């Protein structure tokens, strides 16, 4: 959430920065509410100062010999009580305005970092680096074709069980999925991450804190009777691990690695990636999440990105890193590096991780602070996929496919799967 003071005092700057995202914004209503709130604050402060003056005067007059029950003191006390009533009315009006302002602010995305490249679409994303040599053999199959031959998952029966865009992993496919989850968690915890297995159902406050609500309500699955939602990413519950908390500065950074099934409606993606594991309503993901001191968030962004890259490197999967332009940034992000893995069957790079620094945007929405001495300030948060498991499986199938129909697995994964290659059963 944006800082109310910035909106009130520097609306031109806010409008300019949000404009870098490629959308014109109208802050008129926000400014009006913020100014009304400021006027009420000044009125209340003036009345409270007058009330304090009257209270002191009552004490002084009694000390000077005035009758505590006399008309002179009674009149002053009556004035003081009248002021208290006015203050109470103003406080209620302030409370209502504050709530209205917050609801308005919840709909605005984060301000992009100054370092974030400007752009109008994903075509303006900037490639930072590549790793590995992309395989470009002729006659390679896409992952869903390989999976059909190896009987790794069953989509037809999944439609019967649920609907389209669900998949039931079978046999070697289920084993490979489980192996990837364990491999990713082991790799991250070996680097000091604390493993988390959060609830899959989260409340509205959690989704609001991380930035999914109110903007993305239609893209999430909801259990309306209980005010619970199926989490779209472990970023949501992990953000709320420390909601409404003050984290001592000497405990930062906090680094978590959280496995969770994720659920998304994928609204607006009709007709895209209809086969295979790329775009599903339910998928597994290992999420990396950092709570850091504000002074260290840029450094942490490089580190969390490197930790996500380490998974791809260990699995010998070629990839590239993109610095997303302002128009392609996610709602809560100040700056994002996308990792795109090479899929030789599809002949394209596809997103497999987004590593974002969110500044104090989520911390303000979730009231997560740190304390140094007597001063408190909002922490900064970062998140990144480490990795999306289904897309990782797709990349392994396409990059490891052999002419005999088998799939050769990377050495790092063999102990987890218990075999060197996947073959028709």
From Swiss-Prot:
Query: Which GO BP terms apply?
Result: selenocysteine biosynthetic process; seryl-tRNA aminoacylation
Q: According to its UniProt record, in which pathway does this protein act? A: Aminoacyl-tRNA biosynthesis; selenocysteinyl-tRNA(Sec) biosynthesis; L-seryl-tRNA(Sec) from L-serine and tRNA(Sec): step 1/1
Alphabetized, the UniProt keywords read: Aminoacyl-tRNA synthetase, ATP-binding, Cytoplasm, Ligase, Nucleotide-binding, Protein biosynthesis
Q: Which GO terms describe its molecular function?
A: ATP binding; serine-tRNA ligase activity
Its UniProt entry gives the catalysed reaction(s) as: tRNA(Ser) + L-serine + ATP = L-seryl-tRNA(Ser) + AMP + diphosphate + H(+); tRNA(Sec) + L-serine + ATP = L-seryl-tRNA(Sec) + AMP + diphosphate + H(+)
Q: Where, per UniProt, does this protein localize?
A: Cytoplasm
Report the EC code(s) recorded for this entry: 6.1.1.11
What InterPro entries does this protein map onto? aa-tRNA-synt_IIb, aa-tRNA-synth_II, aa-tRNA-synth_II/BPL/LPL, Ser-tRNA-ligase_type_1, Ser-tRNA-synth_1_N, SerRS_1_N_sf, SerRS_core, tRNA-bd_arm
* Any one of the GO CC terms: cytoplasm
Provide an example Pfam family for this protein: tRNA-synt_2b
* Chief location bin: cytoplasm
Q: Does the keyword Zinc apply?
A: no
The reply to whether Ligase figures as a keyword in the UniProt entry is yes
Residues bound to ATP:
264-266, 351-354
Q: Which family does it belong to?
A: Belongs to the class-II aminoacyl-tRNA synthetase family. Type-1 seryl-tRNA synthetase subfamily.
Instruction: Relate the protein's function as given in its record.
Output: Catalyzes the attachment of serine to tRNA(Ser). Is also able to aminoacylate tRNA(Sec) with serine, to form the misacylated tRNA L-seryl-tRNA(Sec), which will be further converted into selenocysteinyl-tRNA(Sec).
Q: How does it assemble?
A: Homodimer. The tRNA molecule binds across the dimer.
The domain section of the record reads: Consists of two distinct domains, a catalytic core and a N-terminal extension that is involved in tRNA binding.
- State the name under which the record lists this protein: Serine--tRNA ligase
State the gene name recorded for this protein: serS
């Amino acid at each position: 959430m944006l800082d109310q003071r910035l909106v009130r005092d520097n609306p031109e700057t806010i409008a300019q920065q949000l404009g870098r995202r490629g959308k014109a914004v109208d802050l008129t209503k926000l400014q009006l509410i913020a100014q009304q709130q400021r006027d009420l604050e000044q009125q209340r402060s003036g009345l409270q100062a007058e009330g304090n003056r009257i209270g002191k005067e009552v004490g002084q007059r009694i000390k000077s010999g005035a009758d505590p029950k006399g008309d002179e003191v009674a009149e002053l006390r009556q004035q003081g009580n009248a002021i208290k009533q006015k203050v109470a009315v103003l406080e209620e009006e302030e409370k209502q305005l504050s709530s209205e302002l917050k609801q308005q602010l919840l709909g605005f995305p984060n301000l992009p970092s100054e370092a974030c490249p400007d752009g109008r679409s994903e075509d303006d994303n900037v490639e930072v680096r590549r790793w590995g040599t992309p395989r470009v053999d002729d006659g390679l199959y896409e992952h869903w074709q390989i999976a059909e031959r190896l009987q790794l998952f069953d989509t037809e029966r999944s439609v019967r069980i649920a609907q389209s865009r669900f998949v039931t992993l079978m046999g070697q496919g289920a084993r490979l999925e489980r192996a990837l989850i364990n491999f990713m968690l082991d790799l991250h915890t070996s680097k000091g991450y604390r493993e988390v297995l959060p609830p899959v159902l989260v409340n509205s406050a959690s989704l609001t804190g991380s930035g999914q609500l109110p903007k993305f309500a239609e893209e999430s699955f909801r259990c309306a009777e209980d005010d619970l939602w199926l989490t779209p990413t472990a970023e949501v519950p992990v953000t709320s691990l420390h909601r409404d908390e003050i984290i001592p500065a000497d405990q930062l950074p906090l680094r978590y690695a959280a496995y969770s099934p994720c659920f998304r409606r994928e609204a607006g993606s009709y007709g895209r990636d209809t086969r295979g594991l790329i775009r599903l309503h339910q998928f597994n993901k290992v999420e990396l999440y950092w709570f850091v001191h504000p002074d260290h968030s840029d450094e942490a962004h490089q580190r969390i990105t490197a930790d996500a890259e380490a998974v791809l490197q260990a699995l010998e999967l070629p990839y590239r890193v993109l610095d997303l332009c302002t128009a392609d940034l996610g709602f809560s992000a100040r700056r994002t590096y996308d990792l795109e893995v090479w899929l030789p069957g599809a002949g394209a790079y596809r997103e497999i991780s987004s590593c974002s620094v969110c500044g104090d945007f989520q911390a303000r929405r979730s009231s997560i602070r740190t304390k140094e001495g007597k001063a408190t300030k909002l922490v900064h948060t970062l998140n990144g996929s480490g990795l999306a498991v289904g897309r990782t499986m797709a990349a392994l199938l396409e990059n490891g496919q052999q002419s005999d129909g088998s799939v050769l697995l990377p050495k790092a994964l063999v102990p987890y799967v218990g075999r060197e290659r996947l073959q028709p059963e």
